[in-house]
């Protein structure tokens, strides 16, 4: 049974969140009555309002109004006044992933999972299915530049979603095709152990029906190990690995662009197909790997090589994924969501490969628990930056953990051998340091999942103000 349109008003607690806003927008576009609340004003909240969705700021019981269904995410505490009011009114309380699964049930669905790279890969799959005229529904964990939003309500049979593993609810998603980009020791506050993370991803793949398939990156040892344990589902492997079914090779870089080839080898038919001189308007081998996952799916769905090439070349990227925010005196400034050591390392490697000058990393640690679990990894992930500036920790509601703060991280990075790492406190410190020692052709890269994106967007304007007139060069 499909969820009836006359189910009543659906209320989203935390509707401005990147995961919730896309689901709310698609339900609204499909004709359902949608409203919600969030703690603060944001670009997502404003976008939803422009579409006609009523959004309250602040969480109060009266915000529910005449709601008949209440949707919440793991971030919503059970002490939330709206959650309590919904319980008292005996309204259905639905987890975010269950609502996403409801959208997927009556479509052919692709779920993109993995510890890192999900958002970019989801966007790339969407771009190639767009190019192939599939007109998909898309719900992503980041703003897709081509759409100006994190969702798309297409009329086609296919749906592409980002599968968030952070709270384990991605196992509820009914996917016909499952992608796993990588598996790392992340979200241990939920899983408790790395073995539990491994088990969850195995279940994610094994949930694929017999007529579907999994797309697994065998450049990552954990994913290659997972591929070896799947014996009752069709698996397509990808990566730079010479044994991959869909392999990328012959990379060449031109600033922020990458050229490469892809070799597709079918284990079913033995047939080989080469896609030559593909252009990806992004830097970084990790992004080429993400693109290769999308190519594997597009090829399997019968999209022509020409349309794959076109879709890839026209890919507009994702907000906060190595996004250029501006420049000043030839210094290029970028914003990236990377907050895990693996992500930080990949972004800085891409910056190093692209920059003609030095790389200056400005990192905002995200959550004390992540620092605690991955302290040694954080100490070793900044090697491709000439200078590292560490900001105060963005706590995301957590209490500090003694011995695992920003000052301790700075000392730990120094002890691991980095030659120039410093503690900073605010944007004023960044303006002062960058204006004094950065030079033309240097890259300044902001990293973090917290509010550091505001610094990244503000810095070009602040620096241009030092000249007494606006020399800001926007993207």
Curated annotation (Swiss-Prot):
PANTHER family: UDP-N-ACETYLMURAMATE--L-ALANINE LIGASE (PTHR43445:SF3), UDP-N-ACETYLMURAMATE--L-ALANINE LIGASE-RELATED (PTHR43445). This is UDP-N-acetylmuramate--L-alanine ligase. It comes from Bartonella tribocorum (strain CIP 105476 / IBS 506). Its EC number is 6.3.2.8. Keywords: ATP-binding, Cell cycle, Cell division, Cell shape, Cell wall biogenesis/degradation, Cytoplasm, Ligase, Nucleotide-binding, Peptidoglycan synthesis. It catalyses: UDP-N-acetyl-alpha-D-muramate + L-alanine + ATP = UDP-N-acetyl-alpha-D-muramoyl-L-alanine + ADP + phosphate + H(+). The lineage of its organism: Bacteria, Pseudomonadati, Pseudomonadota, Alphaproteobacteria, Hyphomicrobiales. ATP binds at residues 114-120. Cell wall formation. Its main location: cytoplasm. It is found in: Cytoplasm. The gene is murC.
């Amino acid at each position: 049974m499909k969820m009836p349109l006359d189910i009543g008003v659906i209320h989203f607690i935390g509707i401005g969140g990147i995961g919730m806003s896309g689901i709310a927008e698609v339900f609204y576009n499909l004709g359902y009555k949608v409203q919600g609340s969030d703690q603060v004003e944001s670009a997502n909240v404003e976008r939803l309002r422009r579409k006609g969705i009523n959004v309250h700021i602040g969480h109060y019981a009266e915000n529910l109004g005449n709601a008949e269904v209440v949707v919440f995410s793991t971030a919503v505490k059970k002490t939330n006044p709206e959650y309590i009011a919904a319980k008292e009114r005996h309204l259905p309380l639905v987890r975010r992933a269950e609502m996403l699964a409801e959208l997927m049930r009556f479509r052919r669905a692709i779920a993109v999972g993995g510890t890192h790279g999900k958002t970019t890969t989801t966007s790339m799959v969407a771009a190639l299915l767009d190019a192939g005229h599939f007109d998909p529904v898309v719900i992503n964990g980041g703003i897709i530049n081509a759409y100006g939003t994190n969702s798309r309500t297409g009329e086609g049979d296919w749906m592409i979603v980002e599968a968030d593993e952070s709270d384990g609810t991605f196992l509820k998603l009914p996917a016909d095709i499952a992608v796993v980009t990588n598996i790392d020791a992340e979200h241990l506050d939920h899983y408790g152990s790395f073995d539990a993370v491994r088990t969850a991803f195995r279940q994610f793949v094994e949930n694929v029906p017999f007529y579907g398939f999994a797309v697994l990156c065998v450049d990552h040892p954990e994913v290659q190990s997972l591929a070896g344990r799947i014996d009752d589902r069709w698996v397509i492997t990808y990566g730079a690995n010479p044994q991959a079914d869909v392999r990328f090779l012959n990379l060449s870089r031109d600033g922020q662009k990458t050229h490469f080839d892809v070799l597709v080898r079918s284990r079913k038919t033995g047939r080989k197909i080469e896609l030559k001189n593909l252009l990806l308007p992004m830097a970084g081998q990790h992004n080429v790997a993400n693109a290769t996952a999308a190519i594997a799916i597009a090829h399997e769905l019968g999209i022509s090589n020409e349309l794959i090439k076109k879709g890839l070349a026209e890919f507009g990227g994702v907000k906060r994924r190595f996004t250029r925010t501006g420049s000043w005196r030839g210094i290029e400034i970028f914003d990236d969501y990377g907050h895990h050591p693996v992500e930080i390392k990949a972004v800085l490697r891409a910056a190093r490969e692209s920059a003609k000058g030095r790389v200056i990393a400005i990192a905002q640690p995200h959550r004390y628990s992540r620092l605690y679990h991955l302290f040694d990894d954080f100490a070793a992930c900044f090697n491709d930056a000439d200078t590292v500036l560490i900001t105060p920790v963005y706590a995301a509601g957590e209490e500090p953990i003694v011995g695992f703060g920003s000052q301790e991280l700075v000392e730990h990075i120094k002890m691991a051998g980095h030659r120039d790492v410093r503690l900073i406190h605010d944007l004023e410190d960044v303006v002062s340091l960058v204006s004094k020692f950065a030079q033309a052709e240097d890259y300044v890269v902001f990293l973090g999942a917290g509010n550091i994106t505001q610094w990244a967007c503000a810095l070009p304007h602040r620096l241009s103000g030092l000249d007494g007139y606006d020399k800001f060069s926007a993207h």
